[in-house]
């Protein structure tokens, strides 16, 4: 079942140009090395997304405990474990792309005083490179209802696995 959830998350394969916003220094590094690096997400702009994920899990588990779940201690242990794994455990690496090459929000983040670039990449090439490195390409989920639904599915599945032991 976790494979089905994962497959669904990564099933929306990009077909249009993907854009990577960076600084001129980043551009020079990419051109000189002919390599696009994935960075540790804890040190990127996106690090808040990890904390947000942990917060959503905490809310879901707290709601279950408040509703009178039969094993609150076990749920709290799961919460501690998953929070640690998300914030301190696995090293997660990411390279960020957008489907729009001209977004004001991205220019503000990457072009201090107008000194940034938006590099367009063929999505087939990005997918090929990701597959060679055992990376997965997927869209960020920004819709809060979709985020909560996904968290609920994962907690349900993990609870099912834990409670069978």
PLM feature spans:
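Partner-binding and oligomerization surfaces adjacent to conserved cores of proteins
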Residues: 1-165
């Amino acid at each position: 079942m976790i494979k089905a959830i994962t497959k669904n998350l990564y099933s929306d394969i990009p077909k249009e140009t993907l854009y990577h916003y960076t600084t001129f220094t980043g551009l020079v590094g990419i051109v000189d090395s002919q390599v696009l690096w994935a960075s540790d997400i804890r040190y990127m702009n996106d690090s808040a997304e990890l904390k947000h994920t942990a917060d959503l899990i905490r809310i879901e588990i707290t709601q279950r405990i408040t509703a009178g779940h039969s094993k609150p201690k076990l749920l709290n242990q799961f919460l501690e474990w998953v929070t640690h794994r998300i914030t301190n455990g696995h090293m997660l690496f990411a390279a960020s792309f957008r489907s729009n090459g001209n977004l004001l929000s991205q220019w503000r983040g990457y072009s201090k005083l107008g000194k940034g670039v938006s590099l367009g990449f063929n999505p087939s090439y990005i997918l090929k490179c990701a597959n060679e490195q055992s990376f997965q390409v997927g869209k960020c989920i920004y819709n809060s209802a979709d985020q909560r639904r996904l968290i609920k599915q994962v907690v349900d599945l993990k609870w099912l696995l834990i409670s069978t032991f």
